[in-house]
Amino acid sequence: MFSDFLSLMFTAALMTLGLAVCSLLLGLFLSLIFAVLEANRFVGKPMTVFVALLRGLPEIIVVLLVYFGSTELVEMLTGEYIEFGAFGCGVLALSLIFAAYASQTLRGAIQAIPKGQWESGAALGLSKSYTFIHIVMPQVWRHALPGLSTQWLVLLKDTALVSLIGVDDLMHQADLINTNTHQPFTWYGIAALIYLAVTLISQVGIRKLELRFTRFERGVK
């Protein structure tokens, strides 16, 4: 019995990891869009208000609004009732939360790039988009890595929130097993150890990335 429950926990851990990775990828994409739009003179202010709203709301509220509100919003716009899956809504909600904070990190990293980089690109006849993607962004990721790493660790722990909307993640599985066994300390403890293991492995990976991204700076010193 114990081994069966333990197998379910590890399966749920894979679901949690998949949820976190999907949210990270979508969140990075959204955070870049948010950072660019906030710098735009036409939509900058509304975008700033939207990001501030995401940052100001409790994260569980964002998850619930996305899960219950997405169906109502689509029905309002199209007149059709479409029920969205809990996993997809969880990914979207966590991505929005991640992007609200990561966009500020990216925005600061973009502003840290010397204007001479843009001017050099223009002098070489490169378009602004080419300069941004191929010259500016590689440097932006290096500057933003410490902040983004912290947000990734927060995101890993925030995945526990989606258990409330029915995603079969680690916390949801721990709840179900505890209901059957009445051993909360055992199963929540195992869940905590799995979260801790993933976090520690992530920290090692982040450290290696930081060393790789700064190898040229360390070589100059």
Swiss-Prot record:
One of its GO terms (biological process) is amino acid transport. It is found in: Cell inner membrane. GO terms for molecular function: transmembrane transporter activity. PROSITE patterns: ABC_TM1. Keywords: Amino-acid transport, Cell inner membrane, Cell membrane, Membrane, Transmembrane, Transmembrane helix, Transport. Its main location: membrane. It holds the Pfam family BPD_transp_1. One of its GO terms (cellular component) is plasma membrane. Residues 13-206 form the ABC transmembrane type-1 domain. InterPro entries: AA_ABC_transptr_permease_3TM, ABC_transp_permease_HisMQ, MetI-like, MetI-like_sf. The chain crosses the membrane at residues 17-37, 49-69, 82-102, 121-141, 186-206. It is a multi-pass membrane protein. NCBIfam families: HEQRo_perm_3TM, PRK11123.1. The complex is composed of two ATP-binding proteins (ArtP), two transmembrane proteins (ArtM and ArtQ) and a solute-binding protein (ArtI). Belongs to the binding-protein-dependent transport system permease family. HisMQ subfamily. Part of the ABC transporter complex ArtPIQM involved in arginine transport. Probably responsible for the translocation of the substrate across the membrane. This is Arginine ABC transporter permease protein ArtQ. It comes from Haemophilus influenzae (strain ATCC 51907 / DSM 11121 / KW20 / Rd). The gene is artQ.
